[in-house]
From Swiss-Prot:
UniProt protein name: Leucine-rich single-pass membrane protein 1
InterPro entries the UniProt entry points to: DUF4577
Species this chain originates from: Homo sapiens
Positions where Phosphoserine occurs in the chain: 24
One annotated Gene Ontology cellular component of this protein: membrane
UniProt subcellular location: Membrane
Main location: membrane
Gene: LSMEM1
A Pfam short name: DUF4577
Annotated transmembrane regions: 65-85
Length: 131
């Protein structure tokens, strides 16, 4: 037989309700058997279980503290990654500017090389004509 998690949760609430009823009946019996003022009875508010509280509050708060720490560390890592992306973008801009400048330098060197080759060809033609 399988029970869903809701069935087990509702079963726990029913058991709490049964315990509350039994405590209430015991309190009524004590009132009927004991004279007034001879026994200090706890107010009913102390015996009514509050749905939001249980004995696992310590583990629940520990869970939330751990979750908070994980979120803070994650946020720090995200900011670090964003910082690295910005720095990498700046470095890429620098490299791009250098390559553009070097490309212009290379074009200038090619132009100078062509001028030298033309001059050498002219000199070779002059030498061949003189011979």
């Amino acid at each position: 037989m399988t029970h869903s998690s809701q069935d087990t949760g509702s079963c726990g609430i029913q058991e709490d309700g049964k315990l509350y009823v039994v405590d209430s009946i015991n309190d009524l019996n004590k009132l009927n058997l004991c004279p007034a003022g001879s026994q200090h009875l706890f107010p009913l508010e102390d015996k009514i279980p509050v749905l939001g509280t249980n004995s696992g509050n310590g583990s629940r708060s520990l869970f939330f503290v751990g979750l908070l720490i994980v979120l803070i560390v994650s946020l720090a890592l995200v900011f670090f990654v964003i910082f690295l992306i910005v720095q990498t973008g700046n470095k890429m801009d620098d490299v791009s500017r250098r390559l553009t400048a070097e490309g212009k330098d290379i074009d200038d060197l090619k132009r100078i090389n062509n001028m030298i080759v033309k001059r050498l060809n002219q000199l070779n033609q002059l030498d061949s004509e003189q011979n």
